[in-house]
Regions:
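Glycine-rich phosphate/adenosyl-contacting loop at the front of the ribokinase-like
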Residues: 1-60, 68
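Conserved N-terminal subdomain of the carbohydrate kinase-like
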Residues: 25-28, 50-118
């Protein structure tokens, strides 16, 4: 059997909102919204893959569209998801943050309860 590293941790969909101009609270601000794969576990697994290390990634995916997007990202990077958990009806871990016009975080919201599923393995 080929040596590998098992990474246990979260995979998140990171959603960032960045206003074009000075952030005006309690108002709608024109700007850009980006979606990127993230999560500490996923980022460690990604870095290991970039180093050529075989990775088995034990994480939890919900039953939503974010799960498929993140699962595809992990597979494209060559991670083995054979041990990953599918949580039907669960919300895939999501992190939403708003920055100011310079990119400094002003507010973050973390919806990561699905990661608690990993405790019960």
């Amino acid at each position: 059997m080929k040596p590998y590293v098992c990474v246990v941790g979260a995979v998140n969909l990171d959603i960032c909102g960045r206003p074009e101009k000075k952030l005006i609270f309690r108002d709608s601000n024109p700007g850009a919204v980006t979606l990127t794969p993230g999560g500490v576990g996923r980022n460690i697994a990604h870095d290991l893959r970039l180093l050529g290390v075989e990775v088995k990634f034990l994480t939890a995916f919900g039953g939503d569209s974010h799960a498929q997007l993140l699962r595809n990202d992990c597979v494209e990077l060559g991670m083995d998801l054979g041990c990953a958990l599918d949580v039907p009806g669960g919300r895939t871990s999501t992190y939403l943050y708003i920055t100011d016009e310079r990119g400094e975080m002003q507010l973050g919201l973390s919806d990561t309860d699905i990661s608690l599923s990993l405790i019960h393995i």
